[in-house]
Structure formats: structure tokens, C-alpha cells
């Protein structure tokens, strides 16, 4: 679950990280009042959406007057912001963040992720703040410095000092960086985060460190023990189809192709998308119905896939390990009949009762094409899309 910038900064403040004074506002009048609380300008106004690239899209602006703040709020509140990280429809802007402008002498980067190869929380720091860390990793990887947290001892002060010295900090700045490191590490662990990022972490002309922007991702599997964070969720930022899928415990990710994919198992789903692409097709989605696929879940999966107007065919790839393929076949037939599927449906069944399931599909009289293998399924669904 993603958090907005203003929510991340609220948590930063709770854990002792220095942030600019700012207020999240949902009306132009509130935005003007926030500017008055902060004091004299200039101010920075930022659209609050779950996407990067806001500045280049016009969603971040430095303004000199309250009239300009009012105009910015009127321009964006209730609208959708399109950035390079969103789809063509963009993300809805329900709030803007008003902050006092900060003078910047230097920009740094500090972030943390879960490194699955080492099974540790790994902190990364760089002198190249203010740009995407992926660009730094690609072009100048030697400028990224790392430390891993031991799960038994947790973050240690010496690790913060080590990163600070590698960034060229000393004295008061090294001490401040160490405190920010410990605070962010504690926040990461206590709030069950999967990613935390301060970019940029700036040094002001007075020599103080300030968290100018923040991004936090919470582990969705841990939300049952994070009720306060769960209340921060903004459902409006989620894709409607992905939200519908989550209600049925389906893992769905929208893509840009025209072949809908329904598979049980994440690895098989990724392999299915790969082989569709290999044979010239373009997957419209990733959809994992899980090991306990039922008629109801298959029906909802069809509804979600077909809600994408670009879908011109559907590929169902089921491996019957936990589930019986004949029951899945009955579920597919019932779902196709209930939903009213008007595009070709190619089904490949393998495993427990696969032959019986294939016969059931063949005898259904519906527009369902039974495939003999995964390769055959990919070829057939691509041919169906091409009208062959």
C-alpha cells in the first residue's frame, strides 16, 4: 500500500525526522489558509498522487503569492494528473500539499528496501539526490552506498556514521544524518514497510539536513497489525480493476495489450505472458486466481478481464495440482455463460483430471477453444486476435 507524500512526512515527524512545515489541503481556501499559517512566501504547492514525475507534469510549483496558490488548487483539485508513471487517464488529485519553499545547498538521497537475495533491509545513500535512484544505479552505480540491517540487532549508530562519511558529511551534518538514518530505520521496521525513500534529503545554506520529499510503501500483508496506516489508504488512487480483484483475493495487474490472461499461480502467470509475447501477442493483464480457484472467483476474474475494452481474446491456463481441472472447466463454462463472453476464449488444462476437463469444454457448445499445450494455447489465442 502506497502512502501520499504528506502522510509520509507526518510519519517522518513522529519518528524525529526533520521536515518542512506543510499542510494537506482539499480546497483552494484551505490552501490559502495553510500559506498564512506557514508565513511569508515563497511557497511550494504539490499535487498528492501515488506517482512520480509530478514536477515535469506541472503538479509541483513554486509560487510567490496566495492568489497563485488559490489558482493552482483550483486548477488541480478534482482533476487527474498524468505523469510518466501513470496510465493515460492519470491519477485523481484530491489534495495538495502546501509548504514553505526551502533553499537548497546540496541534495542527497537516502532510501531503504527489502533485499530478497540477502534477506535483509538494505539502506542506500547517494550524493546524487533529486533524481531517480534507478538512473543513478544505471549510470553511476559506484555513487550508491549500502548498509544492511542485521535482523537480530537492528539499525546501529555506526551504520549511520558510515553512510554519512561516505557522503562527505562531517560534524553536525554527520550527526544529523545519523539521527535521520536511525529514525527512518525504526519507522521502516515498526510500520512494516517494504520501501522508504527520502529524495531529496537536502542540506540548507545554514548547514541543516531536511527531508524535502518522502515516499513510503507499506507491506499489504501486514496491514492487519497496522490499523493506523490502514486508515491512511486512498482507494481513489488504485486502479478500479485491481481494487475489484483484491476483494476476491485475485492478484491482478493491468497491462497495455489485448489478450486477457487468467492463470493459477504467479510463476505460471508470468510464464504464460512470456510465451504469449514470444508468439507475437500482447498480454492485457497479469491475473493469478490462486490455487483455490472456484467458479465464483473464475466468474469475477472474467468480469475483471472483460472490463478492459482492449481485450480481444482470453487465454485461461490452469495447472490442476490443488484443484481438479474438471471442476475448473465447469467453472469456466458457468462463467462464460453468466458473463456473456463475446471474444474467443482459449483454455489450456494440465494436471488433475485434465482430460475430463478438456472433454467438458469441448461438449459445452460455447465459443471455447481447448488447447493441447501451452505453446498451442499461445498460438491459438494470438491467431484468434489476428482473426485467423
UniProtKB/Swiss-Prot annotation:
Succinyl-CoA synthetase functions in the citric acid cycle (TCA), coupling the hydrolysis of succinyl-CoA to the synthesis of either ATP or GTP and thus represents the only step of substrate-level phosphorylation in the TCA. The beta subunit provides nucleotide specificity of the enzyme and binds the substrate succinate, while the binding sites for coenzyme A and phosphate are found in the alpha subunit. Belongs to the succinate/malate CoA ligase beta subunit family. The keyword Ligase applies. It is an enzyme of class 6 (ligase). GO terms for biological process: succinyl-CoA metabolic process; tricarboxylic acid cycle. Keywords: ATP-binding, Ligase, Magnesium, Metal-binding, Nucleotide-binding, Tricarboxylic acid cycle. ATP binds at residues 46, 53-55, 99, 102, 107. Binds 1 Mg(2+) ion per subunit. This is Succinate--CoA ligase [ADP-forming] subunit beta. Heterotetramer of two alpha and two beta subunits.
Amino acid at each position: 500500500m502506497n502512502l501520499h507524500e504528506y502522510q509520509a512526512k507526518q510519519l517522518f515527524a513522529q519518528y524525529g525526522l526533520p521536515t518542512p512545515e506543510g499542510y494537506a489541503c482539499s480546497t483552494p481556501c484551505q490552501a490559502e489558509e495553510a500559506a498564512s499559517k506557514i508565513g511569508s512566501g515563497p511557497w511550494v504547492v504539490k499535487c498528492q498522487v501515488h506517482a512520480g514525475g509530478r514536477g515535469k507534469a506541472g503538479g509541483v510549483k513554486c509560487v510567490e503569492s496566495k492568489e497563485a496558490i488559490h489558482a493552482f488548487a483550483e486548477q488541480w483539485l478534482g482533476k487527474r494528473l498524468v505523469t510518466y508513471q501513470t496510465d493515460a487517464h492519470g491519477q485523481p488529485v484530491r489534495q495538495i500539499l502546501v509548504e514553505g519553499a526551502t533553499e537548497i545547498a546540496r541534495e542527497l538521497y537516502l532510501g531503504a528496501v527489502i533485499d530478497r537475495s540477502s534477506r535483509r533491509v538494505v539502506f542506500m545513500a547517494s550524493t546524487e539526490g533529486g533524481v531517480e535512484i534507478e538512473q543513478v544505479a544505471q549510470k553511476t552505480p559506484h555513487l550508491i552506498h549500502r548498509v544492511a540491517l542485521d535482523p537480530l540487532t537492528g539499525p546501529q549508530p555506526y551504520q549511520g556514521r558510515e553512510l554519512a562519511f561516505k557522503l562527505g558529511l562531517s560534524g553536525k551534518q554527520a550527526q544529523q544524518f545519523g539521527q535521520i538514518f536511525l529514525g527512518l530505520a525504526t519507522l521502516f521496521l515498526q510500520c512494516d514497510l517494504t520501501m522508504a525513500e527520502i529524495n531529496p534529503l537536502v542540506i540548507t545554506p545554514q548547514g541543516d539536513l531536511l527531508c524535502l520529499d518522502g515516499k513510503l510503501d507499506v507491506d499489504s500483508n501486514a496491514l492487519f497489525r497496522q490499523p493506523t496506516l490502514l486508515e491512511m489508504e486512498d482507494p481513489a488512487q488504485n486502479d478500479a480493476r485491481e481494487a475489484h480483484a483484491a476483494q476476491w483475493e485475485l492478484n491482478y495487474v493491468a497491462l497495455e495489450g489485448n489478450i486477457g490472461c487468467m492463470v493459477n499461480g504467479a510463476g505460471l502467470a508470468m510464464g504464460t505472458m512470456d510465451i504469449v509475447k514470444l508468439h507475437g501477442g500482447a498480454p492485457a493483464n497479469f491475473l493469478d486466481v490462486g490455487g483455490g480457484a472456484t467458479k465464483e472467483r473464475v466468474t469475477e476474474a472474467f468480469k475483471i478481464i472483460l472490463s478492459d475494452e482492449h481485450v480481444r481474446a482470453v487465454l485461461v491456463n490452469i495447472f490442476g495440482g490443488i484443484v481438479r481441472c474438471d471442476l475448473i472447466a465447469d467453472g469456466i463454462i458457468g462463467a462464460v455463460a453468466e458473463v456473456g463472453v463475446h471474444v474467443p476464449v482459449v483454455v489450456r488444462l494440465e494436471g488433475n483430471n485434465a482430460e475430463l476437463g478438456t472433454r467438458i469444454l469441448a461438449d459445452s457448445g460455447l465459443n471455447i477453444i481447448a488447447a493441447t499445450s501451452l505453446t498451442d494455447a499461445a498460438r491459438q489465442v494470438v491467431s484468434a486476435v489476428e482473426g485467423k
